[in-house]
Amino acid sequence: MKNWNRKAEVAIIGGGIMGTSTAYYLAKRGISDVVILEKDLLAQASTGLSVGGIRQQFSNPANIRLSQQSVRVFENFKDDFGVDNKFRQVGYLFLAQKEETWNDFLSSVETQRKHGVPVEVLSPGEIKKRWPYLNVKDLKGGTFG
């Protein structure tokens, strides 16, 4: 690495989705003296090499709202950034084997629906019908959204 001696108003460590997003939104707010410090090439580390996933099935309303905003960003990515990110929503299936986990899922579903998250509550039989390759023998149920 070259000797680099420069000052910046903001230094961001990491050029993945969090670092580049932070730099982008700082620039939108008029803070342009920003440097991103990344050891790899951009989009060549964990973010760029991941298959990615955005879910809205959280128990905390703040996390739900953040993920809903993320979905909007990814849905509009091509229009806003000129790059087709090939975003498509296919859903997340969460499975519960323990009664306590199942009760937590059901409680979370109430919160999710209250915040506009389209989520389904599924019995083991419904899960088996949609995903016949899954072993549902020990399941209490699942949620899909």
Where are these regions (language model features)?
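Beta1/beta-strand and adjacent pyrophosphate-binding region of the FAD-binding site
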Residues: 3-18, 35
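Helix-loop-beta segment of a Rossmann-like dinucleotide-binding subdomain
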Residues: 4-5, 85-94, 130-145
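Hydrophobic alpha-helical packing residues
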Residues: 26-27, 112
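Glycine-rich FAD pyrophosphate-binding loop
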Residues: 27-47
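Short beta-strand/turn micro-motifs at beta-sheet edges
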Residues: 38-43, 82, 130-134
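Dinucleotide-binding Rossmann-like beta1-alpha1 core, especially the glycine-rich loop
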Residues: 52-130
